[in-house]
């Protein structure tokens, strides 16, 4: 009897997941995502048909190295950090419409486009001077317009 209990427990362990603070879980059952995210804590699931995807909902930083065009036609190498956060209640929507690689496919892509559009209106010296704050605000505005309706 004791051996049977251990076997039963061992067979259930692959069907457990822990969702940490600062994350939500999204259940994928037979390839379909549940619409409601799972709160932090212990989650039990059937491992054959179900996966638990973890989505960070805390503030996340990604650093991007790329070349910005300037108004006078110069290229300026820059290393820029982007801070973003996935809205917890929209995590299933983000995974369903964009996929698990949402950071590279959407956040970084939108940033590259917005940064290139904005920096092309400024001189190269402005990118590293007092105009930098204004440039940051314009990039943030463009990114917010695109990302706010998509769960960010």
Residue ranges, per PLM feature:
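Sec-dependent N-terminal signal peptides
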Residues: 4-13
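Post-signal peptide N-terminal segment of mature Sec-exported envelope proteins
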Residues: 25-54
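Beta-strand elements of well-folded, non-transmembrane domains
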Residues: 30, 72, 84-88, 143, ...
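Flexible, solvent-exposed short loops/turns enriched in glycine
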Residues: 43-54, 98-118
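N-terminal post-signal-peptidase region of extra-cytosolic proteins
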Residues: 51, 59-71, 96-97, 137-142
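Structured, soluble extracytoplasmic/luminal domains of envelope-associated proteins
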Residues: 77-106, 110
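Amphipathic, coiled-coil-like alpha-helical scaffolding segments used for oligomerization/assembly
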Residues: 83, 103-152
């Amino acid at each position: 009897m004791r051996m049977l209990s251990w076997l039963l427990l061992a067979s259930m362990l692959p069907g457990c997941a822990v969702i940490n603070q600062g994350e939500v879980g999204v259940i994928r059952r037979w390839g379909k995502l549940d619409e409601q995210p799972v709160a932090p804590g212990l989650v039990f699931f059937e491992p054959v048909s179900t996966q638990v995807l973890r989505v960070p909902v805390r503030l996340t930083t990604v650093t991007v190295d790329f070349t910005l065009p300037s108004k006078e036609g110069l290229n300026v190498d820059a290393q820029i950090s982007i801070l973003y956060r996935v809205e917890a209640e929209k995590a299933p929507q983000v995974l369903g419409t964009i996929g698990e690689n949402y950071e590279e496919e959407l956040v970084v892509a939108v940033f590259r486009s917005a940064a290139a559009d904005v920096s092309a209106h400024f001189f190269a010296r402005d990118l590293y001077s007092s105009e930098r704050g204004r440039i940051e605000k314009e990039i943030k505005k463009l990114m917010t317009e695109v990302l706010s309706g998509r769960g960010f």
